[in-house]
Structures are given as C-alpha cells and as structure tokens.
Curated annotation (Swiss-Prot):
<feature type="binding site">
    <location>
        <position position="61"/>
    </location>
    <ligand>
        <name>S-adenosyl-L-methionine</name>
    </ligand>
</feature>
<protein>
    <recommendedName>
        <fullName>Ribosomal RNA small subunit methyltransferase H</fullName>
        <ecNumber>2.1.1.199</ecNumber>
    </recommendedName>
</protein>
<keyword id="KW-0489">Methyltransferase</keyword>
<dbReference type="Pfam" id="PF01795">
    <property type="entry name" value="Methyltransf_5"/>
</dbReference>
<dbReference type="GO" id="GO:0005737">
    <property type="term" value="C:cytoplasm"/>
</dbReference>
<dbReference type="InterPro" id="IPR023397">
    <property type="entry name" value="SAM-dep_MeTrfase_MraW_recog"/>
</dbReference>
<dbReference type="InterPro" id="IPR029063">
    <property type="entry name" value="SAM-dependent_MTases_sf"/>
</dbReference>
<keyword id="KW-0698">rRNA processing</keyword>
<keyword id="KW-0949">S-adenosyl-L-methionine</keyword>
<feature type="binding site">
    <location>
        <begin position="42"/>
        <end position="44"/>
    </location>
    <ligand>
        <name>S-adenosyl-L-methionine</name>
    </ligand>
</feature>
<dbReference type="GO" id="GO:0071424">
    <property type="term" value="F:rRNA (cytosine-N4-)-methyltransferase activity"/>
</dbReference>
<dbReference type="InterPro" id="IPR002903">
    <property type="entry name" value="RsmH"/>
</dbReference>
<feature type="binding site">
    <location>
        <position position="95"/>
    </location>
    <ligand>
        <name>S-adenosyl-L-methionine</name>
    </ligand>
</feature>
<keyword id="KW-0808">Transferase</keyword>
<comment type="similarity">
    <text>Belongs to the methyltransferase superfamily. RsmH family.</text>
</comment>
<feature type="binding site">
    <location>
        <position position="109"/>
    </location>
    <ligand>
        <name>S-adenosyl-L-methionine</name>
    </ligand>
</feature>
<comment type="function">
    <text>Specifically methylates the N4 position of cytidine in position 1402 (C1402) of 16S rRNA.</text>
</comment>
Length: 327
C-alpha cells in the first residue's frame, strides 16, 4: 500500500456531484474521523475536512493520477488528510495502518471521474480515440479492456455486455466484435465505438438518445475493474467499522450498483429474521440502521444545469443505530 500526499501536480477541474446533500447526509462532527473510499480529486473530502474543526479523513483511490491531484488539493489540511493508493474494498487495511478502530462516517461516490473520461489515453470514453485500457489503476496487472475485447469468448462478451451494460443488442455487438477481431485486433476506443455503432440496427440508431456504444463501454469498464465485486466486498464490511450514530453515504450512477446498495440497506434495517412460519420472534434481531431518505436523493435543476453528469447520480444514506445482534 502506498501512502501519497503530492503537492506538485496541478489540479484538473472536476465537479463533485450532490456536494451539499452528501455533506448533510454525513453530518460531520468536530474531531471526527471519516473515510472517503473513492477520493477522486478530493472534492467531497475537502468539503468534509472543512465542515468542522479537527476532522481527520482517510482517502482511498486506485487511480494514482487522481490521488496525486487530490493530494495537492488537500495539502492545506496537513496531517488531517491521510491518502492511500488502494481499492476501496481494502479500506480496513488502510484504517488499521492508521490505528483507527472506527470511522464516524464513510462515503463512496461510485463513478468515472471527469479526469478519466476526458483523457483519451485512459480508454474510458468513446469520444476521442485512445488505447483500450479502462483500468482505474493503470499500473495493475489486471486485464485491460483490450484483453476483454480481443481475447474473451463470444459468450463471455455477450454476458458481460448484457448483464453489466443492460444492453438489449448485446448478442449483435458481441458477434460483431468476435468477427472483426478475426481479421485484425481492435486496439482503440474509436475502433470499438465505430464497430458497436455499426452493429446497431439502423432503426435503433435513428431513435437513440445517446451514443450506441454507451452501454458497451460501461459494461467493459465495470468488468475490467470488478466494480460490483468491489462494492459487494465494501458493503459486507463497512457496518462493523461504524459506531452507533455513524453514517454511510453512497452515490451510484448505475442501476445495478444502486440496487445492490438498496438491498444491503434494506437488510440492515430489518428487525426480526425468523422464518415466516414461526408465529413469534425468537431471533431477537433488531434493526442496525435507520435509512435517512425515503427515496434516493438526486440532483436538482441548478446542479444539472451546471453539471450534466450528475443526472444519473443517486445518493442513499443510513445512520447506524445498533450493533449486529449476531442472528
């Protein structure tokens, strides 16, 4: 694990989504300790650290470029900002390294940053033309999008695009990819985007409100970075690190991720978990959290006008009210 605090890199403009709503959900307390599992360029982290005196924050990101930019942005907070280069599912390792046994609040903002989307060489976007990469951590040994596109089977590609991208044309797109790579490898985002666009039926292209490659690129990015697995592993652990009164806020941009967060929070808020045929509760299980909003919080008109990428963002948050009774 690499602890990083850079003060040499110039920051790139990036607007954090739902900034006011996220801070309200976390309700930071003076002297509290907070975890930002998806640090990005430090927008939410800066707001948390500025919100009350004496706050400390542990910020994680597997994108070294973003981590360096965040380090520069947060340098004015000195030793109150602790930054680590790691996956957010490995947050316990970072907290243990700091000697923390609890955090008063935790935040995830699960999306691709403007930094990643706007730099063609990162391979996340179908606008521009860059290498097929899509790895959040470009120095990792994990297979890139190039491997997925040029080496995986038709069935695996189809399943990936259909499941993670929720793409109705997954079969046509996977077939087009497999047929094309038999002639030449598909090396760039531009090549892949054009291939996907041609695979779409003309009638679908004519009425499409977004680029035909949107869902395919999303699916490949999620597969390359194991994004659902990351989220599942985080949710399985985080509640044990919150004290009574501690809060968790999660911002998602994709229906599969939002569904996973919603299901986890519903599970935590359950009371009795006895089988239905038992007439009286014998498990004694009590709700572990209270859900802070009846519906997910979404961006208002002003934010959408300033940042169109906030349109699909959904914020869900809980407050811990009891320890797990062990049932």
């Amino acid at each position: 694990m690499i602890q990083t605090m850079s003060d040499t890199t110039e920051p790139t403009r990036h607007v954090s989504v739902l900034p006011v709503e996220t801070l309200a959900a976390l309700d930071p307390r003076a002297g509290g300790r907070y975890l930002d599992g998806t640090l990005g360029m430090g927008g939410h982290a800066s707001a948390i650290l500025s919100s009350a005196p004496g706050i400390e924050l542990c910020g994680l990101d597997r994108d070294e470029e973003a981590l360096a930019l965040a380090g520069q942005r947060l340098s004015s907070f000195g030793g109150r900002a602790h930054l680590f280069h790691c996956r957010y599912s490995d947050f316990a390792e970072a907290l243990n390294e700091l000697g923390w046994d609890k955090v008063d609040g935790a935040l995830l903002d699960i999306g691709v940053s403007s930094l990643q989307l706007d730099e063609a060489e990162r391979g996340f976007s179908f606008y521009g033309d860059g290498p097929l990469d899509m790895r959040m951590d470009q120095n990792s040994a994990q297979p890139s999008a190039w491997h997925w596109v040029n080496r995986e089977s038709f069935d695996k590609l189809k399943d990936c695009i259909a499941t993670l991208g929720e793409e109705p044309q997954a079969g046509r797109i996977a077939r087009a990819i497999v047929d094309a790579r038999q002639k030449n490898t598909i090396d760039t985002t531009g090549q892949l985007a054009a291939l996907v666009e041609r695979a779409y039926p003309a009638a679908w292209r004519a009425k499409a409100r977004r680029h035909p490659a949107t869902r395919t690129f999303q699916a490949l990015r999620m597969a390359v970075n194991d994004e659902l697995g990351e989220l599942r592993r985080f949710l399985d652990q985080i509640l044990t690190w919150l004290p009574i009164g501690g809060r968790l806020a999660v911002i998602t941009f994709h229906s599969l991720e939002d569904r996973m967060v919603k299901q986890a929070m519903r599970h935590w808020v359950e009371g009795c978990r006895c089988p239905r045929h038992i007439p009286r509760c014998i498990c004694g299980h009590q709700p572990e959290v209270r859900i802070l909003h009846k519906k997910p919080v979404q961006a208002g008109p002003e934010e959408l006008a300033a940042n169109s990428r906030a349109g699909s963002a959904k914020l869900r948050a809980v407050e811990k009210i009891a320890e797990d009774s062990g049932s």
